[in-house]
Design a protein with these regions (language model features):
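Short, gly/Ser/Thr-rich active-site loops of penicillin-recognizing serine hydrolases
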Residues: 245, 258-263, 284, 330-398
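Short, P/G- and charge-enriched loop/turn segments at secondary-structure junctions
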Residues: 8-12, 50, 131, 218, ...
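Short, surface-exposed loop/helix-turn segments at secondary-structure junctions
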Residues: 288-299, 336-341
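Short, conserved catalytic-motif segment at the N-terminal edge
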Residues: 2-51, 333-341
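Short, surface-exposed beta-strand/loop micro-motifs that present aromatic residues
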Residues: 299, 306-319
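Short active-site loop at a secondary-structure junction
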Residues: 14-21, 40-97, 127-140, 224-227
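Structural recognition of the beta-strand scaffold that forms the well-ordered cores
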Residues: 21, 97, 310-311, 319-322
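Short, surface-exposed loop or secondary-structure junction motifs
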Residues: 91-295
Length: 398
């Protein structure tokens, strides 16, 4: 299987994504493929295409935090309020607990439903710690850490990002704010369809160059560290290779990032997510793992809602990059009503297929597309680079 087979599967065979750019390699190797269109006008994906990185932004935030720690400017054991006093309910909470998703963080009201950016900030600053209920992963943790970064550095998030990552790696096509003349190169996120408990939701307000994430959009033009960056395939390759070459932080510090802080097997046999420093880490069950089978437990990775995935492994020296668009004119979320499954709505059990919308149009599904990546992306990477499974099936997990 080749990377072009990956593109063909997602773009042509299943139509899960309207466009896709995939890459794999190492510090000195890069193999790429791409295909599809980025907008309703049919503009082909190219090396100028700007992808909404969504939660891949957290990788930048996590690396930036650890860079400040390496420089001695941030003490992870100190409370959040030492660096960001506006978080009055986190006065006894060490930064490292927030950084590793080791506590639950709850705002009084939803940030994305606030009428103004200032009201949204007030909700964020009123966040309170609590027990983790359900998923440990959340956007709020990275948003808090963004403010911690600014307090520790006595500098704006964007300035520190430029100093520590964007400028050293020559990432000239990675933007916190997309220039007006480059918005034509942005993927379109218009026409997102959702079905939640029988309610049909159509989002038509997404604008090119504005983050798709509702919280990031509400707080824009301020970038809050959890989402909001835009970048090209080429720049993201520079990012991955720069991390592998230790141009951002040391291998020792990356290993610290990759340490599991949350994951465990519950008494009922289910698992809590395996998370590290604002990232996913290796999971013992591959179906639930954002880290591919051929990468080690020194890998860090993330997925972005808009159709993105990245993993970087200093153990094997391999990186993977999946930049797509699962939003434009797609069904992205389907939460079935009680007693129903995806098949009751006309989809296949794995989320593939299409549905007929209220107006009679047929909408292709990208629901649960992430579980297609192992067979149709990571297998292609393994074949391309000649990579065996890092840990044999059935081998005990330490």
């Amino acid at each position: 299987m080749t990377l072009q087979d990956t593109v063909r599967y997602f773009i042509e065979e299943t139509k899960i994504l309207p466009c896709l750019s995939v890459t794999c390699g190492g510090a000195g190797l890069c193999v790429q493929a791409r295909g599809g269109v980025i907008n309703e006008q049919g503009t082909p994906v190219s090396d100028r295409t700007l992808f909404d990185l969504a939660s891949l932004t957290k990788l930048f935030t996590g690396l930036l935090t650890m860079r400040l720690w390496e420089e001695g400017r941030l003490d992870l054991t100190r409370p959040v309020t030492d660096y960001a006093p506006q978080y009055r309910y986190l006065s006894n909470m060490p930064v490292e607990k927030v950084l590793g998703f080791e506590i639950g963080l709850i705002t009084p009201e939803r940030i994305d439903t606030q009428k103004t950016p200032e009201a949204a900030k007030q909700q964020l600053w009123a966040v309170q710690p609590g027990e983790i209920r359900g998923r440990a992963y959340s956007d709020i943790h990275a948003m808090v850490i963004r403010d911690v970064i600014e307090g520790a550095a006595q500098s704006e998030y964007g300035a520190e990002l430029t100093r520590c990552i964007l400028r050293p790696l020559e990432m000239a096509e990675t933007f916190l704010h997309v220039p007006e003349e480059r918005r034509v190169d942005c993927i379109s996120c218009r026409g997102e369809h959702r079905i939640e408990q029988g309610k049909h939701i159509l989002r038509t307000d997404a604008q090119p160059g504005i983050p798709h994430d509702p919280k990031a959009a509400r707080l824009y033009p301020e970038i809050m560290g959890h989402a909001g960056l835009f970048s090209t395939q080429g720049d993201m390759v520079k990012f991955a290779q720069g991390v592998l070459r230790e141009q951002v932080i040391s291998k020792m510090t990356i290993r610290k990032m990759a340490r599991n802080r949350t994951g465990f097997r519950r008494a009922d046999g289910t698992y809590q997510q395996y998370l590290g420093t604002l990232c996913y880490v290796k999971h013992p069950v591959q179906y639930f793992s954002e880290i591919p089978a051929y990468e080690s437990d020194e890998a860090i990775g993330l997925a972005g809602f808009t159709g993105q995935h990245m993993s970087i492994d200093i153990g094997t020296g391999v990186f993977t990059l999946f930049l797509g668009n699962r939003v434009m004119n797609r069904l992205t979320v389907l939460v079935p009503e009680a007693g129903k499954s995806l098949t009751d709505y006309g989809l296949q059990a794995d989320g593939r297929g299409s549905i007929v919308w209220d107006d009679g149009t047929r909408v292709v599904s990208s629901v649960n597309y992430v579980h297609q990546k192992d067979a149709h992306f990571h297998q292609a990477v393994a074949d391309t680079l000649g990579l065996p499974a890092w840990r044999r099936a059935g081998t005990a997990w330490s």
